[in-house]
Amino acid sequence: MNRKQGMDLTHFATMGTTRRSVLITGALGSVAVFAGRLPPAFAAEKPKVGLVMKSLANEFFKQMQAGAEEYASKNTDKFSFKAVGMKDERDFAAQVDAIENFVTQKYNLIVVAPADSKAMVTPIAKAVKAGVVVINIDVELDQEAKKAAGIDLAFFGPDNRGGAKLAGDALAKALGPGGKVVILEGNPEADNAQQRKKGFDDSVAEGKLVLLDSKTAHWETEEANTLMTNFMTQHPDIQGVMAANDSMALGVVKALDAAGKSGKIQVVGFDNIPAVQPLIKAGKMLATIEQYGAQMAVIGIDYGMREMAGEKFTGWVKTPVKLITAKELA
């Protein structure tokens, strides 16, 4: 399976708590089947599964952790589990330490959402060469860096460019041609930030919008608040904002509230964290993108167990995204 011919899991794109549980239950059933075919080396004791996430200050990763822990609690007879997150979005050293610690502690499977698509390849390659099964979720590792390190890992995650374009297109439709917008980017070193920027740029071009400015706020709420305040000073005619995640969208709305412009400038985000849903209902945000973070970690564990059972996955195993507006939240 090459990069363009990746397996597609978008049939899991369901909405609401009940349907989310269905996905988790379905994946749980898969692990129950595949765990029964683990190699003899794992028969003596349960496999140890580690999850390495980005910042737990970001509600998206809190949801990811909760989903994984719920899943693990229902599979205590199949594997032991530990989740580790960073204190903020640029705490790369914490991710490196977590992976190295899991290897030292002889974990069998590590599921990782890398904060840096290139820098994280080296510790991940060491884990792979130590015999650990590694599953890359959420943020794709750099292809050339993987090749240079001699590893071939599948990517289990969303179409970040396509998801951002869904949000950007919703904004373009609301503003019409000539609408003046700014973009708040994620960490420049992360592939998902790069892909979301491309998706927003696609919407700007196709919707004939005017891009006034585009800068990074490194996924962080307070940094986004400051950046948006500066944007409004530099560009008082802003009509719309594309934020590459909801944490930054929260910072944007905070800045708009302080300036008395909330609801007057349209805002789109990405992640569908609980905190933005009332803002969308109230008209302070136009839309966000659901990318099913809780299920993403479960899918990573599921496919990792399958790899330990002898299967091999390459390329891109696509997970779903969906545009969320006030209509979906009604």
Each model region followed by its residue ranges:
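N-terminal secretory signal peptides
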Residues: 1-36, 40-42
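A residue-level marker of the well-folded mature domains of exported/periplasmic proteins
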Residues: 12-14, 24, 43-330
